[in-house]
Amino acid sequence: MKRNLLFIILLLLLPGLHQVFATSTIKKVAPTFWWAGMKNPELQILLYGDRISSADVSLSADNITLQEVVKQENPNYLVLYLDLSKAAPQNFDIILKQGKKQTKIPYELKQRRPNASAVEGFDSSDVLYLIMPDRFANGNPSNDIIPGMLEGNVDRNEPFARHGGDLKGIENHLDYIADLGVTSIWLNPIQENDMKEGSYHGYAITDYYQVDRRFGSNEEFRKLTQEANAKGLKVVMDMIFNHCGSDNYLFKDMPSKDWFNFEGNYVQTSFKTATQMDPYASDYEKKIAIDGWFTLTMPDFNQRNRHVATYLIQSSIWWIEYAGINGIRQDTHPYADFDMMARWCKAVNEEYPKFNIVGETWLGNNVLISYWQKDSRLAYPKNSNLPTVMDFPLMEEMNKAFDEETTEWNGGLFRLYEYLSQDIVYSHPMSLLTFLDNHDTSRFYRSEADTKNLDRYKQALTFLLTTRGIPQIYYGTEILMAADKANGDGLLRCDFPGGWPNDTKNCFDAANRTPQQNEAFSFMQKLLQWRKGNEVIAKGQLKHFAPNKGVYVYERKYGDKSVVVFLNGNDREQTIDLVPYQEILPASSAFDLLTEKKVELRNELTLPSREIYLLSF
């Protein structure tokens, strides 16, 4: 009888005993690992698991100090701050103790790569090639659909669906990209976007430390970066600190309400970011512009929360250290908190002094954009610490200039002259990202019918690749891909022909391109290969002249070498007097890099309709 009674008591106690000896379920550890020897010795580790906030936390580690344990409103989170100033590479345990229950979380502090802090960023010697990974090439069809992910279909006939492009597809065409002559690739976001729809573009991140499995793995991305670098190509990674995807665990089960603006409640942004530098702006409009959300499915981070700020900053440093990327393009830069973003840029620069960051600064004019660049006189005494900003106004001017007739006072190439004459507003004009189009705008050619006019293409490319700044080319421009934003963003991001195994046309191969496509490709390739390693273009001073008879003339000069460009901005032949240009014409003849012929420069110069001379001295 006593034995039976004891047995019954044990059965009743089993659930409790299970709770005493079981370990907590840890769902996320971010970052997943770190490195010893970083310049900033502080490490934030975010732990996410079932009701872990009541745990006593300790470390089983050598020379690592647990500085702070911060509970959040949500009992499923703990935020740890560690001091690694004396730590060597090691494996250690984070120990959570709740009563008699103990959980050990293994953690690795890795050895840094040799010269990791010396990673070389992109600059005005580079040309970036922008790729939307889902739309470039499908190198691994087996990862098109991943069981359990929310968007479980691939449909190349639907502009807003996933099409199956991936990292392997990009890797397979690195030789094509390098042969074109660009020196860097910028990838639209590759981090996990486990959203129900529209996940192809990547701008609704659900895990900041994980490559989307439909693109590949973290290791595959690191391999892509290494192979690209080996072929002379830098890699720029797209990041988003302003917002995440609504299926991100940080939003679905918020650590605290103040991790997101408006306590996680949807309030639409006004998109009026000019309020941030407007001396007359109301507090209300400033707040709505910056704290408001892009969409219901893109909750807006509160970067004023120190834990959020550190989480985001560390995530970017983790990718630089892990994958060896050469640059970051920060999406919607002015929509995030100014002070936090300035802190981020400074933190990255302190760890990687040669690194570069470009912020998406989509504002209506150069005055507004200049505010966001490092050392801006307009922002003083504040400083964004952002080295490079995107020159959207120049894009707008270029998309008009090469369609119009040029006079001495307006229209056509006068737009470019007048716009560049205002570069005084920029603290670092050579560090502006310049482009004809990108994944958010109409392509430079809006329809296939427009592509018959290659004069427009050739003049625009010549200007883009010889003026000040860091040029960016959107994938497919070299084969005259065309699209109009009026028809929807999905069509701006069409598949590259030949990127999929069953494509009927493969434009990676010259034999399958039309004569016009090959002419366009060859022209771009010639300019890009000439520009590569050209110090005159990378470092040279710019001097220009107001258009005369519709002809725009400018010089790039570095040391005793120079390049002089003549662009005829009219549909008729023009003859110009060369006397006004003698200060930039050191010889009576010069070699034209495009025709590979000598051009006489004695008294006058005649330029046929829409002609280009690219002269080297």
Swiss-Prot record:
The active site is at 331, 360. Disruption phenotype: Reduction by 30% of the rate of growth on starch. It catalyses: Hydrolysis of pullulan to panose (6-alpha-D-glucosylmaltose). GO terms for cellular component: periplasmic space; plasma membrane. Ca(2+) binds at residues 138, 143-144, 164, 166. GO terms for biological process: starch catabolic process. Residues 1-22 form the signal peptide. It is found in: Periplasm. The record marks 440 as: Transition state stabilizer. Its cofactor is Ca(2+). It is an enzyme of class 3 (hydrolase). InterPro entries: Cyc-maltodext_N, Cyclo-malto-dextrinase_C, Glyco_hydro_13_cat_dom, Glyco_hydro_b, Glycoside_hydrolase_SF, Ig-like_fold, Ig_E-set. One of its GO terms (molecular function) is neopullulanase activity. Binds 1 Ca(2+) ion per subunit. Pathway: Glycan degradation; starch degradation. Gene3D superfamilies: Glycosidases, Golgi alpha-mannosidase II, Immunoglobulins. Keywords: Carbohydrate metabolism, Glycosidase, Hydrolase, Metal-binding, Periplasm, Polysaccharide degradation, Signal. SUPFAM superfamilies: (Trans)glycosidases, E set domains, Glycosyl hydrolase domain. Pfam families: Alpha-amylase, Cyc-maltodext_C, Cyc-maltodext_N. Neopullulanase that cleaves 1,4-alpha-glucosidic linkages in starch to produce disaccharides or trisaccharides in starch degradation. Belongs to the glycosyl hydrolase 13 family. This is Neopullulanase SusA. It comes from Bacteroides thetaiotaomicron (strain ATCC 29148 / DSM 2079 / JCM 5827 / CCUG 10774 / NCTC 10582 / VPI-5482 / E50). The lineage of its organism: Bacteria, Pseudomonadati, Bacteroidota, Bacteroidia, Bacteroidales.
